[in-house]
Amino acid sequence: MSATLQSFLPAPKYSALPHSRDDDENDEYDNTEAGPSTSSSSSALVSTSSPSIPPYGQRAAWRPRTQADYANGGAYPECHVAQYPLDMGRNRSAATSNKLAMRIDGEGNKRYDAIVKQSLRPGQTVQTEFKDLVPLSQRTDIKEKDRNSGFERPSHEEVMSNTERTRLALEAITKGKNKPVVPKAGNLPGQQQAAQFIRYTPAQQGAGNGTQRIIKMTEAQRDPLEPPRHRFKKTAAGPPSPPPPVLRSPPRKVTAQEQKDWMIPPAVSNWKNNKGYTIPLDKRLAADASGIQDVVINDNFAQFAEALHLADRHAREEVRQRSIMQQKLAAKEKAAKEEHLRNLAQRAREERAGVSSATPSVLGRDDDVASRLADSDARPTRATPRAEGGMSAMLAGYRSDSDSDESAASDEEDDEGARERDRIREERRRERQRELRMSNMGIEQRTKQLLREQNRDISEKVALGLAKPTASKESMTDSRLFNQGESLAAGYGDEDSYNLYDKPLFSGSSAAAAIYRRPAARGGANDIYSGADDTALEEELGKNDRFGLGQSKFRGVQGDADRDSGSGSAPVRSGPVQFEKDTSDPFAINQFLEDAKRGIKRTSDQDADDARKKLRDEHDS
């Protein structure tokens, strides 16, 4: 097989000779890299070429590799390599190199497990292959007897030997750790040191005193109460940590310009000068440092300011246009409102003038008929819509279509005119009723009406003609504010006083005081009610009947009875009417409770009385 394989392989370029132990690892690596076939072929070549040693003078490219190359002789001087004939001069100690030789298994794969298997103790196992992870029961490369060989129960002797070996190892570790801690017997305090014998030979041998002597040295006795001589001292601080490395250029000489640039002026304060030094102005300005830096303004600031200015101007223009438009709309609305109010006022004045001239009186019937006749004579005669409708129906056969259309249009105009006249009559009627109510209005209602008229807007007053022009144009302030006191505390009262109501309720308002007081023009109450004149009393009651209750509602019951009986007028009361207080039980609850306590039963008479009372109550309701 080897011959057949060599027949296919090319001729070797170099002669492959076996390596010796003294060769370096590179040559061994090259040899093992070639694989088992190459090693076998090389061994064959060695076996054939080992006896053939080149003659002297032709050994420049030849190297002795094995002990057979020396032929039991010495080294070859012409071969400049390390030679160890008969292993003479070879270092037998362990190699100090940490390089490992590359090894190859039978299949040509490199064995990398040599890295972890180096420097192992005897009996130590390292698992470096994948098959080591497979359980032994599933391994196919192990025989059945080898598979169960490692699972036998150990014997008693093996267990005891392993236990004893483990105990001794643990004791050795423990003693090694405790040895520095446990002191010797002689080093314990209070114990006497053992005596030492020292052979002493003097240096001077003259005068016959050079004989050797043996000296017994013992420890001197120490006083147990003596204070300790050892003093604790502060240990000197160790050297500091080295400075960190700084990567910088080598130092060079500083120029005058650089010194000038690096010159920092002294601090000169603008507020303090405790020493009173006279500081030149240029030094003060140099210390200010305001002019050292050049102020660089970005162009975007100008653009931003310009944009803000344009936006502000545009916004102001929009606001101005909007305000102008609002003013125009407000003026137009105000003008329309004034025009509307002016038209209303004009219409009211015209209607009032028409009512006063053509409206009949309230009480006179003849004047009403006369005014209607005069109104009918003054207006042109026009047929009523019903008469015109009947006439148009009679003449329907004698008219054309155009005449009928004209008649229909005229009818619509007449109807519209009639509706307008009805509306005017209704407005005039309402106006007359309003005037009548105002004429019959009491003082209170009239005061409220006056206040309502005073609270009108000035534009409404101008439109209705009620506004009065100001007599003087100089008074532009409210004169009512000048008659006030200094403050609230000036005229109100002292803070310790309790008289909260220092003035009457309606002392300052004449309109409100008139509600509860009779006007002086109509006479006081004493003038009317103190006298015995019945005519004046009835007249006053008839005039001041505000609520429409009539005079009979104001008369006393006792006075009516006396008047009916003819006994005369009612007795004059000196004070207000006194009402009697009903102290009895109106619902008979107390009587009911007393009856219930006594246990009184209801009789038939009481039931009949209750039935009559219930019937009477239902009839009254």
Curated annotation (Swiss-Prot):
Where in or outside the cell it occurs: the entry states: Nucleus
Q: Which UniProt keywords apply?
A: mRNA processing, mRNA splicing, Nucleus, Spliceosome
Where along the chain is composition biased (Low complexity)?
Answer: 36-51
Any single GO BP term: mRNA splicing, via spliceosome
InterPro entries the UniProt entry points to = SKI-int_prot_SKIP (IPR017862), SKI-int_prot_SKIP_SNW-dom (IPR004015)
**Record field: compositional bias (Basic and acidic residues):** 140-164, 220-229, 364-380, 418-437, 594-621
Source organism's superkingdom? Eukaryota
Composition bias, kind Acidic residues: at what positions?
403-417
Record-level GO cellular component terms: spliceosomal complex
Which Pfam families does the UniProt record give? SKIP_SNW
| Location of region: Disordered | 1-73, 137-164, 220-251, 347-438, 542-621
Which sequence ranges are marked TM in the entry?
A: none
Here the segments flagged for biased composition (Pro residues) are: 239-248
Q: Subunit arrangement?
A: Associated with the spliceosome.
Tell me which family the UniProt entry assigns to this protein. Answer: Belongs to the SNW family.
Q: What's this protein's function?
A: Involved in pre-mRNA splicing.
Q: What is this protein called?
A: Pre-mRNA-processing protein 45
Instruction: Record the organism.
Output: Mycosarcoma maydis
What does UniProt list as this organism's lineage?
Answer: Eukaryota, Fungi, Dikarya, Basidiomycota, Ustilaginomycotina
